[in-house]
C-alpha cells in the first residue's frame, strides 16, 4: 500500500508516543511511503517554531523522510474550494504520488473523504485498516 501522512500525523509521531508513532513505524516497515513537498515544508516550520527543536533535528527529520519516502513536489491543482490552499496541496500531492491512503487528523480533509479520489482516514482509521478492520 502507498501511504501519505499529513503534517499533523508526522508531528505527533515525532512529539509523542502513541498511535501516530505506531502507524508511522508500521508504514515504514510494511508499506511504501510518499511525502509531499508541502508536508515537508510545513513539518520543518512546526518542528522549528512550535516544538522549538534545533535546526539539526529538523534537518535530520527532513533527511530521514527523503531517504525513506518518495518526495512528490509537483501536483496539478485540485478544485476542492472548501479546503485551504495547503490542504488542497497536501491532497493533490498525495493523489499525484498515487497514494492509496492519506492519513490525517485535519477535520477539513476528513470531511471531504467521501468525495476524494483516494481514501482519507484518521490515524485511528489507518490503524484499523492495518489490522484488517
Identify what each model region corresponds to.
Residues 7, 87-88:
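Conserved glycosyltransferase catalytic-site signature
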Amino acid at each position: 500500500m502507498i501511504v501519505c501522512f499529513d503534517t499533523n500525523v508526522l508531528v505527533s509521531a515525532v512529539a509523542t508516543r502513541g498511535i501516530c508513532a505506531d502507524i508511522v513505524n508500521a508504514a515504514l516497515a510494511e508499506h511504501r511511503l510518499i511525502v509531499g513537498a508541502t508536508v515537508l515544508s510545513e513539518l520543518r516550520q512546526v518542528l522549528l517554531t512550535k516544538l522549538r527543536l534545533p535546526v539539526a533535528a529538523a534537518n535530520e527529520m527532513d533527511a530521514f523522510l527523503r531517504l525513506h519516502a518518495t518526495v512528490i513536489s509537483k501536483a496539478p491543482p485540485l478544485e476542492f474550494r472548501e479546503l485551504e490552499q495547503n490542504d488542497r496541496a497536501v491532497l493533490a500531492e498525495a493523489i499525484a504520488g498515487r497514494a492509496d491512503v492519506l492519513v490525517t487528523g485535519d477535520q477539513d480533509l476528513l470531511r471531504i473523504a467521501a468525495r476524494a479520489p483516494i481514501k482519507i482516514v484518521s490515524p485511528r482509521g489507518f490503524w484499523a485498516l492495518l489490522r484488517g478492520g
